[in-house]
Regions:
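Donor-sugar nucleotide-binding helix/loop cap in glycosyltransferases
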Residues: 1-172
Length: 172
């Protein structure tokens, strides 16, 4: 799918980013460790700073983390700039189609809430499940560990922002 015409390809790209703590730390953190459903950019930044200070041995600039949050929100959230300004700044990322992050009704906050994600192809969900189990070297995994993570590992439920019912439905 060289032109990203299949929504499944975009879901796969999201999974590859959200499950990679080494190369996509901010995205991994957001989808696996940040569980606040409505938040401001500043709240997200404070949480990321806390996560990085606990998990990364090298010091990271606050400006770098602020830029990371801005990039993440632009990658996953629909542009609000309308037709003003530079055309490239008004273009949305393909990841916006997944509707994993949206602006709140006030416009000053963001939302990232679990839903049923009917547009998540079962093939991508299955691939993510097999990859997770292979990476953990497991033949079985409890549903609660698929839903949430407590030890900075990947959780399919939070990575795809699924409700518990949606996760169980996809497993069936």
């Amino acid at each position: 799918d060289p032109y990203l015409e299949d929504e499944g390809t975009i879901w796969l790209i999201h999974w590859l980013l959200a499950s990679n703590s080494k190369l996509a730390t901010s995205i991994f953190w957001f989808f696996n460790n940040f569980h606040k459903q409505e938040f401001t950019q500043d709240e997200a930044l404070l949480s990321l700073v806390d996560f990085v200070s606990q998990d990364i041995s090298k010091p990271v600039s606050g400006n770098t983390l602020k830029q990371d949050i801005g990039v993440l929100l632009r990658m996953y959230g629909r542009s609000t700039s309308g037709n003003k300004g530079i055309v490239e700044e008004a273009l949305d990322s393909p990841l916006v189609l997944l509707q994993l992050v949206s602006s709140s009704t006030t416009g000053k906050a963001y939302k990232s809430s679990p839903t049923d994600r009917k547009n998540l192809p079962i093939e991508i969900f299955g691939y993510a499940l097999v990859e997770l189990m292979n990476s953990l070297d497991l033949n079985q995994i409890p549903i609660n560990e698929l839903m949430n993570t407590e030890d900075n590992t990947v959780a399919i439920g939070t990575s795809f922002r699924l409700t518990e019912d949606a996760l169980i439905s996809k497993l069936e």
